[in-house]
């Protein structure tokens, strides 16, 4: 019995470890694992099917084939356990030892390990400081290498050809050693003295000057350091002993018909053994050198193939021309060990079936077919049958169940009661793809799903299937109920808005019952309460849509739970009064006293959750659903072709458009417009026409004329079925109705460009052949896109999950005072996202004061901003708030709850242990399939919209300038002379309502603080010309203006005014190379004037194509335009949109022609140009200069003498995120990434909370680059985890030594995932071979901190309820061994359960 206990303990010990280390195996270690040498290539005897002795399946080496039975059958049964049979050499033990016992092959000649040879950078090459090419020549016997030069002039590691070798031998006899093949490499590696090599390299680094040499040296130093630290020896990279995998991991299975199916590994091993034995024989026979060499080369090749087939040369193929699967292939890729078996396991206890709708279910229920339930809950049913005494044995119980006796169903009912099951729909794109429900037994074979959870599962009932899983253990059931129950997941983790929102039929029903119509039966009646309304409605006294007055009782629930009620008479309709009956107590009636569109219903559910909590909201959502279905059925809404009303104006609008197009066509033929302009204008006309027809159509469908009670004819919203559906948000949108009843409009070609002939017909009129063809053209592209999109989106999600998987909330507060400053997001003057939405659910980083009052803070630091606080901020008209962010969080592992803020799916501060990284990745990846795949060509409407030439304010208020430099013009208006200036309009409370960019040279007619009215124009500029504005008053002097060389005189035919255009330097000829046309401003005496506040002369360098309208010597005032540069009609830069754009941002890719930013603050001047580049100089205030060479074709948007600040754009283009980080720092980079990514999602109408993007950004900024190593162990230019540097610096500061200085580095998500501290996580992501090679050389320890590593080693993850288990283990490791054993037996089961109970408590 004691033995048996020991046996179990033996199994248990392996589970208890804190880290995994990977290293090179030494020959002695390999021998110590081995249970014997495999000497023969034979596998099994074809007659007896018994393994051959000393073969690849030998029982003496690997263990018995049957449990407790030796091969020859002499010893059988347990009593002989541990005996080694003297006849056949087999140990009598369990057969499963054949899965763990290894063998070995003694190689007759050393063999280089291909991973360390060929996996770049080649480790053997770095170690020996030889090129891979050279080492391969030695290994494959093409050249000799000097291993020991002795006293000869030869160098160690020098290559010699056959002839050179013979000459050297004759010359120096035996004074030197040279060899070829792996022995030579082995010898070289063996004789390296790492310590002295290290010292030598460090000295060399100090003395070297060249960049490339430095790189090579630091690489070598790092490698040698790794070997010294890990205790690996370099010669172990060349193998002398080869381990043999246990036979049950490379099985040989007999098929029927006497053939065998075998693992490819057996073939590969057989090859190695054959060649090895042959080589051994040849060496014994003293065969000629050339034969031995050939055999050694073949041995090297066969071992290469075994380890990594196809890495070098052609892959070895089997009988069926298919490359054999080597050991490396076993672990890498989607089908490899990591991704197939360790990260994704299959589940028993599951069933799947088609889903149908279950409109009568409650939100926490699902309908489970009886047959399915019986099969899934079989063991529970068996147990219960036995306990009841209805069956004596399991076998009897089985019979009962198979016969499906009546009592079995009763017992099934009992078993199922309060035992939740998990429903999952593939693809599981976010955590709401698996939810728990209580099963309700139903007849039939389809699972019934509650309609309200369809949005979360993205399910519909056109044949979707779902899987059911049964949580078995008590802990699993508890977690399913407390955390995964559908009733606990009302809010979406992506944006914190309700995801349990009615859609389609339900919305239609609620909308229908809440519409108000004129002059319906019973209009104007007054009712005492809602039940009276109901009675009147049931007796057909009033109609559903009649406007009536009703006395409503309002119940207000205050924060303390006190209830107070009051009554009031409300103007409402019959339908809304009936709706008020299902409102929970405490929800104000005015929320429901509107038209119930999808948006309003969502708002209603949200308010209910915030005001009344979870339980009431769930009940309310269910009631809404039942009511919606009931009234949708009553409404009997249906659509026919007559509902698609075509507006009468359509014909007229089309005729107008056609005339316009014809006119442009004529202009084009007479050469007035270019082909591109013609195309753009035509597309423009048609998109405008399409809009006009759509508007006319919506007016036609959406309104109808009726008589009201007074007999007047008025317009009211129509009850057209088509319109109702779109207006309520039940199905369809304006864009789709436009195609049914307006005009189909412009179509896109598959490459995304727009076909200029639109489809003028709509679907009701029908398309003609050509229109139909154009229509299918675009539609087919759409379908092809969708298929590609799914794969791309999935891959993006995988990369995101991988980079963020180990971000977990680990503590409450890290104590940082850093944060991000949040302001409203403004686009084109409109506030797209007000401040309230951006700061909701965040924690304040520093006290917020009233604007202009620094005494009493409105909100103090570390307050979590909920809806009430945000309303307060809005009333105080605060414009910017500094909030805590995960990017600036200082927790050493994971992030802290304060920096993260509110858990969006629960509505309170996030719990410790929440896996926020994975949630962030899912929230960003899940809507990926809704994003577009195409790049937009700007043209037509888009470029028209770009040409804004003034600012007209939309609201009444006061003007405020931000960051604006301006000069006062003689006319009294201001002229902007900065690029980043902005103008805001504030309302009476000082709240920002609009914000606009002010371009350089804009004339501003309002002053700071002026009052403006809505519709007033406050600034204007010429969008087609970029002005150069004089900042001083004086007289013009032209310099280097040579007529016909640098300038051309032009006279305008219409006005007769003369102007000068600067020519292109390329066309000036050789003698004019040095000429640079400049306009200088001088005073009356002809002395140079300087630009205010600088010592630079007031002169403006004129770029090519600029136009000067003034004459030499003319007087200019401050703010006058000296010259102007025509802008090309809106650059047609393709903007990458949709998914590719998001991927580019997360991968931190540099754009093609990036914007050039100012490297420092200072004054701009231009130096001497080179052939294709112009030289831009920024002069600092302290006189130091920075030069930048810029290609001529790029447009420089700054002028000589202008002041720029560090990081300001100097040359237009898409900014590169690396530049933003380098010049402006982490916060602006975060702001940029968040803004750009949000823009893409916002365009598709997807809401994602900023903090998810911030979590990913934090992971992209994990690494830093060492700029100055100080006294640390890092090297200059090395990239290290930020955390390690911070720890090391803290250590150095304690000892009063110099800490290392570093700069943050931005890595793309793929790079960042591969650069994690955990090699297990990196290897299971991508490039498995490279990661493992690197890790083995370094002897890396994986501390199993992330989620992925723990999944792979088969433990609970250190997040959620698993965090308690890990904390328990850490505490426990301080205990004695015996106590440790009791713990490891049943890993602290009490703890996770307790944690779940707590979690459940704050759910309510």
Swiss-Prot record:
It catalyses: RNA(n) + a ribonucleoside 5'-triphosphate = RNA(n+1) + diphosphate. Its EC number is 2.7.7.6. Residues 1377-1404 are annotated as: Disordered. InterPro entries: DNA-dir_RpoC_beta_prime (IPR045867), DNA-dir_RpoC_beta_prime_bact (IPR012754), RNA_pol_asu (IPR000722), RNA_pol_N (IPR006592), RNA_pol_Rpb1_1 (IPR007080), RNA_pol_Rpb1_3 (IPR007066), RNA_pol_Rpb1_3_sf (IPR042102), RNA_pol_Rpb1_4 (IPR007083). Zn(2+) 1 binds at residues 70, 72, 85, 88. It comes from the Bacteria. It is an enzyme of class 2 (transferase). Its cofactor is Mg(2+); Zn(2+). NCBIfam families: rpoC_TIGR. This is DNA-directed RNA polymerase subunit beta'. It comes from Xanthomonas euvesicatoria pv. vesicatoria (strain 85-10) (Xanthomonas campestris pv. vesicatoria). The lineage of its organism: Bacteria, Pseudomonadati, Pseudomonadota, Gammaproteobacteria, Lysobacterales. The gene is rpoC.
């Amino acid at each position: 019995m004691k033995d048996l206990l020991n046996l179990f303990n033996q199994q248990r010990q392996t589970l208890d470890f804190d880290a995994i280390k990977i290293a090179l195996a030494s020959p002695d270690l390999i021998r110590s694992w081995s249970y014997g040498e495999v000497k023969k290539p034979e596998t099994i005897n074809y007659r007896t099917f018994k393994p051959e002795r000393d073969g690849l399946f030998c029982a003496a080496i690997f263990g018995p084939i049957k449990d407790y039975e030796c091969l020859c059958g002499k010893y059988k049964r347990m009593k002989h356990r541990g005996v080694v049979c003297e006849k056949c050499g087999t140990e009598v033990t369990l057969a499963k030892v054949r899965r763990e016992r290894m063998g070995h092959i003694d190689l007759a000649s050393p063999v280089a390990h291909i991973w360390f040879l060929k996996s770049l950078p080649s480790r053997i090459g770095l170690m020996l400081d030889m090129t891979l090419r050279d080492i391969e020549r030695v290994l494959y016997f093409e050249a000799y290498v000097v291993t020991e030069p002795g006293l000869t002039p030869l160098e160690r590691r020098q290559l010699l050809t056959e002839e050179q070798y013979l000459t050297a031998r004759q010359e120096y006899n035996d004074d030197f050693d040279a060899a070829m093949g792996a022995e030579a490499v082995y010898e070289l590696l063996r004789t390296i003295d790492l310590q002295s090599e290290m010292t030598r390299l460090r000295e060399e680094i100090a003395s070297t000057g060249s960049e490339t040499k430095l790189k090579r040296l630091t690489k070598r130093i790092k490698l040698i350091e790794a070997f010294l630290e890990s205790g690996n020896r370099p010669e172990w990279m060349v193998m002398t002993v080869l381990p043999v995998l246990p036979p049950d991991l490379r099985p040989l299975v007999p098929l029927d018909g006497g053939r065998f199916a075998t693992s490819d590994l057996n073939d590969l091993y057989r090859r190695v053994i054959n060649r090895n034995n042959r080589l051994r024989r040849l060496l014994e026979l003293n065969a000629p050198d050339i034969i031995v060499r050939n055999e050694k080369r073949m041995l090297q090749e066969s071992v290469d193939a075994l380890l990594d087939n196809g890495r070098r040369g052609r892959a070895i193929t089997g009988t069926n021309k298919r490359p054999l699967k080597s050991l490396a292939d076993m672990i890498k890729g989607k089908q490899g060990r990591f991704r197939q078996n360790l990260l994704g396991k299959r589940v028993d206890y599951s069933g799947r079936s088609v889903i149908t709708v279950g409109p009568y279910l409650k939100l926490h229920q699902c309908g489970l077919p009886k047959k399915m339930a019986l099969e899934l809950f079989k063991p529970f049913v068996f147990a219960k049958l036995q306990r009841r005494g209805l069956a004596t044995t399991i076998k009897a119980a089985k019979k009962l169940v198979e016969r499906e006796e009546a009592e079995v169903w009763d017992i099934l009912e009992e078993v199922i009661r309060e035992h939740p099951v998990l429903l999952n729909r593939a693809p599981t794109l976010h955590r709401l793809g698996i939810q728990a429900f209580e099963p309700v037994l139903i007849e039939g074979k389809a699972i019934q799903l509650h309609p309200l959870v369809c949005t979360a599962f993205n399910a519909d009932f056109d044949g979707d299937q779902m899987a059911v899983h049964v949580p078995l253990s008590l802990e699993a059931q508890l977690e399913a109920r407390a955390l995964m129950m559908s009733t606990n997941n009302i809010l979406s983790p992506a944006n914190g808005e309700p995801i349990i929102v009615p859609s389609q039929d339900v919305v239609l029903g609620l909308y229908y019952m809440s519409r108000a119509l004129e002059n319906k039966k019973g209009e104007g009646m007054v009712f005492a309460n809602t039940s009276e309304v109901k009675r009147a409605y049931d007796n057909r006294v009033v109609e559903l849509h009649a406007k009536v007055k009703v006395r409503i009782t309002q119940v207000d629930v205050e924060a303390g739970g006190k209830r107070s009620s009051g009554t009031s008479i409300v103007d409402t309709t019959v339908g809304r009064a009936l709706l008020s009956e299902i409102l929970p107590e405490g929800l104000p009636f005015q929320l429901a006293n509107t038209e119930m569109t999808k948006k309003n219903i969502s708002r209603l559910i949200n308010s209910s959750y915030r005001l009344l909590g979870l339980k009431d909201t769930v009940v309310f959502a269910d009631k809404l659903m039942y009511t919606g279905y009931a009234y949708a059925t009553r409404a009997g809404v249906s659509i026919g072709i007559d509902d698609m009303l075509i507006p009468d104006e359509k014909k007229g609008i089309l005729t107008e458009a056609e005339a316009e197009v014809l006119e442009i066509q004529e202009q084009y033929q007479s050469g007035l417009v270019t082909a591109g302009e013609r195309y753009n204008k035509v597309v423009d006309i048609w998109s405008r026409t399409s809009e006009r027809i759509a508007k006319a159509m919506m007016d036609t469908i959406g309104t109808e004329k009726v008589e009201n009670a007074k007999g007047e004819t008025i317009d009211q919203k129509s009850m057209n079925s088509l319109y109702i559906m779109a207006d309520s948000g039940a199905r369809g949108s304006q864009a789709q109705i436009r195609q049914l009843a307006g005009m189909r409009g412009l179509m896109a070609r598959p490459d995304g460009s727009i076909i200029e002939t639109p489809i003028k017909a709509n679907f009701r009129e029908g398309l003609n052949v050509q229109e139909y063809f154009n229509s299918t053209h675009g539609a087919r592209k759409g379908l092809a896109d969708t298929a590609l999109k799914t794969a791309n989106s999935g891959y993006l999600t995988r990369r995101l999950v991988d980079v963020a998987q180990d971000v977990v909330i680990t503590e409450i507060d890290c104590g940082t005072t850093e944060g991000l400053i949040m302001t409203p997001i403004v686009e084109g003057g409109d506030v797209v996202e007000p401040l309230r939405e951006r700061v909701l659910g965040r924690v304040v980083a520093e006290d917020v004061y009233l604007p202009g009052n620094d005494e009493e803070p409105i909100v103090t630091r570390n307050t979590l901003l909920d809806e009430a606080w945000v309303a307060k901020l809005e009333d105080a008209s605060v414009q910017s708030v500094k909030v805590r962010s995960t990017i600036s969080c200082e927790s050493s592992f994971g992030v802290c709850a304060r920096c993260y803020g509110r858990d969006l799916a629960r509505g309170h501060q996030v719990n410790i242990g929440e896996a926020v990284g994975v949630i962030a990745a899912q929230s960003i990846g899940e809507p990926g399939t809704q994003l577009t795949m195409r790049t937009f060509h700007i043209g037509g409407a888009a470029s028209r919209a770009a040409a804004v030439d003034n600012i007209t304010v939309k609201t009444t208020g006061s003007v405020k300038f931000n960051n604006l430099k301006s000069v006062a013009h003689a006319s009294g208006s201001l002229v902007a002379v900065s690029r980043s200036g902005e103008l805001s309009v504030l309302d009476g409370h000082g709240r920002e309502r609009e914000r606009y960019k002010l371009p350089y040279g804009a004339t501003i007619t309002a002053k700071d603080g002026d009052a403006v009215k809505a519709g007033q124009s406050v600034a204007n500029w010429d969008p087609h010309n970029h002005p150069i504005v004089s900042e001083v008053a004086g007289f013009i002097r032209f310099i280097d203006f040579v007529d016909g060389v640098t300038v051309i005189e032009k006279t305008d035919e219409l006005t007769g005014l003369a102007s000068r255009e600067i020519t292109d330097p390329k066309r000036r000829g050789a003698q004019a190379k040095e000429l640079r046309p400049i306009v200088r401003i001088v005073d009356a005496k002809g002395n140079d004037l300087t630009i205010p506040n600088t010592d630079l002369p007031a002169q403006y360098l004129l770029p090519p194509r600029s136009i000067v309208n003034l004459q030499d010597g003319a007087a200019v005032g401050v703010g006058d335009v000296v010259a102007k540069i025509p802008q090309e009609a809106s650059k047609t830069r393709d903007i990458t949109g949709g998914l590719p754009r998001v991927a580019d941002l997360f991968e931190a890719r540099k754009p093609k022609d990036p914007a050039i930013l100012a490297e420092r603050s200072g004054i701009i001047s231009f130096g001497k140009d080179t052939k294709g580049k112009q030289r831009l100089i920024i002069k600092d205030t302290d006189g130091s200069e920075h030069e930048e060479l810029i290609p001529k074709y790029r447009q420089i948007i700054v002028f000589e003498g202008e002041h720029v600040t560090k990081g300001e754009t100097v040359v237009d283009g898409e900014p590169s995120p690396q530049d933003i980080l380098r010049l402006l720092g982490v916060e602006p980079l975060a702001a940029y990434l968040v803004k750009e990514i949000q823009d893409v999602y916002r365009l598709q109408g997807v809401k994602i909370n900023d903090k998810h993007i911030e979590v990913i950004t934090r992971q992209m900024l994990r690494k830093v680059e060492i700029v100055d190593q100080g006294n640390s162990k890092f090297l200059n230019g090395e990239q290290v985890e930020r955390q390690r540097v911070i720890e090391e610096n803290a250590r150095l500061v304690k000892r009063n030594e110099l800490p290392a200085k570093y700069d943050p580095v931005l890595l793309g998500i793929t790079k960042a995932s591969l650069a994690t501290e955990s090699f297990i996580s990196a290897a299971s992501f991508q490039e498995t071979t490279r990661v493992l090679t690197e890790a083995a050389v370094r002897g890396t320890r994986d501390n199993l901190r992330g989620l992925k590593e723990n999944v792979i080693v088969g433990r609970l993850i250190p997040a959620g309820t698993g965090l308690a288990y890990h904390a328990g283990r850490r505490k426990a490791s301080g205990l004695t061994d015996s106590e440790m054993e009791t713990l490891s037996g049943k890993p602290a089961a009490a703890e996770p359960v307790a944690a779940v109970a707590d979690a459940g408590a704050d759910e309510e």
